[in-house]
Each structure stands twice: as C-alpha cells, then as structure tokens.
C-alpha cells in the first residue's frame, strides 16, 4: 500500500479473477505467499478467492463497507416506519449522515424526528456508537471488547434489520476485527474505481477489454512515463 498503484486489472468479479492475479504474480519473480494482508468487502467470491489463493494473507473487511451495511439496515427501518409515520418522508439522508455533516436545518429535523420515532433514534445511536469504536479505538483487544458489547446491544435491540446486521457482523467477525491490526481499508481502491469510471465515461465505452485495461494502468495510477526530446 506504500506506492498505492494498480498492479493488476482483469475482467470479472468472481474467484477466478483473484486466481489469475495470483498466477500473474508468479510470472514476476514473486509468490502469492508473499501477500500477507488483503482488504476487501464481504463478497463471498472475494473471500473464497483470497482464502484459496493467498493462504498467508489475513483478510480485513473494509470498515466503510461495514458502516454501509449498517446504514442499509437503518434505511430499511426508516422505510418501514415511514408507512406508519408520514413525517419521516424525505428524511433518508438525515439518518445516513453523521451529525457533524448535517446542516442546521437537518440537525433540528433530526432532533425532532428522533423524539417522534424511538426505533430510528435507537438505530441511529447504535450506528454512531459503532463508528466511535472505529474512530477512537487503537488497540485490538479494546476493540474486541467494544464490538462484543455493541453486538450484545444489537441482538437485544428488537430491531429486525439491526439484528440481521449483527448476525452478519458475527459471521465475519475475525475479518472485521482484523482492521485494528492491519489498519487497512479499501479507500484507495474505491478512489481508483471512481477514476476508472471517469475513464469509461470519457471514452464513451470500450469495445476492446485489453485496450480498456491498458487505459486503467495509464490513467488510474500515478505512473510516470519517460519523456523523449
């Protein structure tokens, strides 16, 4: 992660894409066994690929993806509650934002809506608490204790989407907790994906996948090409 460069690009989002990457590494006097850390979302295909082809690597599940899934659970609660309380219409982004990113008007609306809907208010506070563990904890064991307490709260929350999120969290626990050892996120790859999508828009689509991959190497990294005079 020191150089933050795209070293390999290939079509596909399944295990075979990771397998091809591991094979490509072998062609460059390296070994897949040298990969010791991998950051990813919770795609079953990626998990299987990394486990099978990077056997020495510890998997870190991206913390932003974890919070994204929790936001989806909160939004599910909001949609259900809106059917009962129409006042919640148009409030989606208020619940998805952190307090420091709300406008004064949104902040006031959040306070009012929180008083009127205890379920959403509880879910929102649970999100802030989980984020605080990520933000303020630097020790692996302290994070473990914090996560266990949070999960106990979530399981007893009586909020279906939150309880389902907690079940997912538990089933991926080791990889989520691994963040406090590796401190890896998928932030760089997400930023690179944005640049790749911009390349695609600029070109109005690529018919040749190999040409597109070449453009990724050139346009989505800070590759310095030699100049000739």
Predicted regions: what they are:
Residues 3-5, 22, 28-60, 64-68, ...:
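Acidic/histidine-rich catalytic cores and adjacent linkers
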Residues 2-16:
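Glycine-rich phosphate-binding "P-loop"
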Residues 16-24:
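Structural motif
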């Amino acid at each position: 992660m020191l150089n933050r460069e795209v070293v390999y690009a290939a079509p596909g989002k399944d295990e075979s894409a990771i397998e091809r990457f591991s094979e490509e590494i072998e062609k460059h006097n390296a070994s897949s066994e040298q990969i010791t850390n991998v950051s990813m979302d919770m795609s079953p295909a990626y998990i299987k690929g990394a486990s099978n082809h990077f056997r020495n690597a510890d998997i870190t599940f991206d913390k932003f993806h974890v919070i994204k899934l929790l936001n989806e659970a909160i939004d599910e609660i909001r949609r259900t509650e809106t059917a009962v309380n129409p006042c919640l219409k148009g409030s989606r982004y208020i619940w998805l934002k952190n307090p420091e990113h709300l406008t004064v008007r949104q902040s006031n609306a959040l306070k009012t809506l929180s008083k009127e809907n205890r379920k959403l208010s509880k879910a929102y506070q649970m999100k802030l608490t989980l984020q605080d563990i990520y933000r303020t904890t630097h020790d692996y064991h302290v994070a473990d204790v914090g996560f266990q307490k949070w999960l106990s709260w979530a399981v007893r929350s009586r909020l279906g989407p939150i309880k389902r999120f907690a079940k997912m969290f538990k089933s991926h626990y080791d990889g989520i907790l691994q963040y406090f050892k590796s401190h890896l996120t998928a932030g760089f790859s997400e930023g690179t994906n944005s640049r790749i999508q911009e390349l695609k828009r600029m070109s109005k689509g690529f018919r040749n996948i190999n040409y597109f991959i070449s453009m990724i190497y050139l346009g989505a990294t800070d590759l310095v090409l030699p100049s000739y005079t």
